[in-house]
């Protein structure tokens, strides 16, 4: 292995967001021998940046890693090159930029493989990772490692990928849809003038989709269509009331528009996910991606859609670290390589990461580049 390769940072560069997973050692760097391995204890930590603000990500890496690691900047003479695991389309699109600005070379990992690897890592090693959310009730799910497969992974990023997972390294992308997080943000910006995903989500919290959506009760005079199992509050047509209200966009409250849009995207994803699970006889569906962000309304909408169409036979399950699946998968791919050439400056990098993982990493909604996801206690074996 190249001695300049660092084994505790991985990136997933998507169309909307850049996700980072990095290792933070506990206290001073220490080693203890166990079966011929050096064991470093610490935490996996998480951060995110908007892809359109990629310079913020570059500055984060430059200041928090390169500045303290003893690695000279690209303009200096004899600087070291760092090989970092990266996945997502941006690993190709921005490879030259990272090389030019930071002297970083990407060791690229396949996007689908990284997603599956990240989910399997979480489900097998992190307690209380998966949970259901229905009717306002959050329930953690105990995962039986002997009965994990097969399952359907629905990753909601800018678009949506649906992957049937049959085992470690055994998966197939069986479907997807272009109506995902990018659709929500794109239409939301056009319709509400919101500037960011977080701002749009916050706006949706205060909205009422019934002002714009046409419900079954609007068609049936306030009653259910019980013969086919539709309640009066079920949505018959998203944005349907705009047809006959005789109003212009400015006549509607932006929070109601945001709420209706979020409901429309979530319902659509939930239904398509179940239909694909039905094709392959899958009962467990895991939803991931930053579109969800632990938002109760989104999770409940997806869960209701899966529950309704499956008549209660299929489960929608969510993940605490939902937005970092690809980055985690890329990170765990370091396990396939030898670390016997680890050099002292790597230890310095680990301390540098630790220095920026404390109070500076508290989450500030909307304006922060840093994510509120919980850290994961872990150790790294250096062979």
Swiss-Prot record:
Pfam families: Fumble
Keywords in alphabetical order: ATP-binding, Coenzyme A biosynthesis, Kinase, Nucleotide-binding, Transferase
Effect of deleting the gene: No visible phenotype under normal growth conditions, but homozygous double mutants pank1-1 and pank2-1 are embryonic lethal.
UniProt cross-references to SUPFAM superfamilies, sorted A to Z: Actin-like ATPase domain (SSF53067)
GO molecular function terms listed in the Swiss-Prot or TrEMBL record: ATP binding; pantothenate kinase activity
Pathways per UniProt: Cofactor biosynthesis; coenzyme A biosynthesis; CoA from (R)-pantothenate: step 1/5
UniProt key word Translocase: no
EC number annotated for this UniProt entry: 2.7.1.33
GO biological processes: coenzyme A biosynthetic process
InterPro entries the record matches: ATPase_NBD (IPR043129), Type_II_PanK (IPR004567)
Tissue specificity annotation: Highly expressed in leaves and developing seeds. Expressed in roots, stems and flowers.
Regulation: Regulated by feedback inhibition by malonyl-CoA.
Reaction catalyzed: (R)-pantothenate + ATP = (R)-4'-phosphopantothenate + ADP + H(+)
Enzymatic class: transferase
Record-stated family: Belongs to the type II pantothenate kinase family.
Classification via PANTHER family: PANTOTHENATE KINASE, PANTOTHENATE KINASE 1
Function: Catalyzes the phosphorylation of pantothenate the first step in CoA biosynthesis. May play a role in the physiological regulation of the intracellular CoA concentration. Functionally redudant with PANK2.
Protein name (database record): Pantothenate kinase 1
UniProt organism field: Arabidopsis thaliana
